[in-house]
């Protein structure tokens, strides 16, 4: 676990395990696979075992929770950068239950759960309506073939529902046969970005502009992570769109404010 993350839209990352099966075009140049292979791990097919961690690893979020409570300020935790928590892999039932218990034990951590498998979420989480206030749920959407994930996301009673449009591989608003434009009703936050890395696919800046415009029109927080492989990218301007650096975050309650309301 990284107690402090280099990912701009979170504070820390926690991976209950490593590995998952690729399920869509966004997975083609998976950075997590590349990273794992550096350490000799081949984890990205359904027949491979996942990589698991010991008790010391699982205690780190408890330490972070104590620090956040002492500071009176919640911390955002991205889960998982090296896996998909909602993958239906036979080895994952037990560690997934351990994760739910950990989330419930750390109310000062805002758990940012990002998945490409929203169809599995309702069955796998142990909570009814409402969910714990510190659970955020997000889906990855790279083109209009996967805008259905936003429809499934809207059905989930999370404090924050978000979309990760990174990498953006096409317009998310141009209708095509059997595909629907993205709708942002019921969504609180959008993270957008082009693909990075040596084999990155180019992102048209117009796709990012129309996504930003839709967020502004719908009152959705917009966070631009990077332009990625777009030819207009210039060093420090990698996350600047039309002269503005977009780093908006969604509104969310802290445990302290919830306690005050209950009192």
Give, region by region, the residue ranges found by the protein language model.
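Conserved AdoMet/S-adenosylmethionine-binding subsite of the radical SAM
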Residues: 57-223
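A generic alpha-helix propensity feature with a strong bias for hydrophobic helices
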Residues: 49, 64, 170, 253-258
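Small/flexible residues
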Residues: 6, 50-53, 118-119, 151, ...
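General N-terminal targeting signals
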Residues: 31, 94-96, 154, 239, ...
């Amino acid at each position: 676990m990284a107690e402090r993350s280099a990912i701009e839209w979170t504070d820390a990352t926690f991976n209950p395990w490593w590995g998952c099966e690729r399920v869509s075009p966004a997975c083609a140049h998976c950075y997590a696979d590349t990273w794992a292979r550096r350490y000799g791990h081949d984890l990205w097919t359904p027949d491979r075992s996942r990589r698991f961690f010991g008790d010391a690893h699982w205690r780190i979020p408890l330490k972070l929770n104590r620090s956040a409570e002492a500071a009176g300020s919640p911390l955002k935790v991205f889960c998982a950068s090296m896996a998909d928590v909602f993958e239906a892999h036979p080895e994952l039932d037990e560690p997934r239950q351990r994760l739910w218990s950990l989330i419930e034990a750390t109310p000062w951590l805002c758990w940012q759960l990002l998945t490409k498998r929203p169809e599995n979420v309702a069955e796998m989480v142990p909570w009814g309506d409402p969910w714990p206030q510190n659970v955020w749920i997000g889906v990855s959407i790279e083109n209009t073939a996967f805008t259905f994930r936003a429809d499934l996301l809207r059905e989930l009673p999370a404090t924050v529902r978000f979309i990760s449009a990174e990498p953006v591989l096409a317009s998310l608003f141009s209708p095509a046969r059997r595909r629907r434009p993205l709708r942002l009703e019921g969504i609180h936050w959008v993270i957008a970005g082009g693909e990075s890395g040596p084999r990155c696919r180019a992102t048209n800046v117009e796709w990012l502009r129309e996504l930003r415009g839709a967020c502004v029109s719908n009152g959705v927080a917009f966070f631009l992570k990077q332009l990625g492989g777009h030819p207009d990218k210039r060093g420090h301007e990698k996350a600047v769109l039309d002269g503005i650096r977009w780093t908006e975050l969604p509104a969310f309650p802290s445990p302290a404010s919830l306690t005050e309301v209950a009192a």
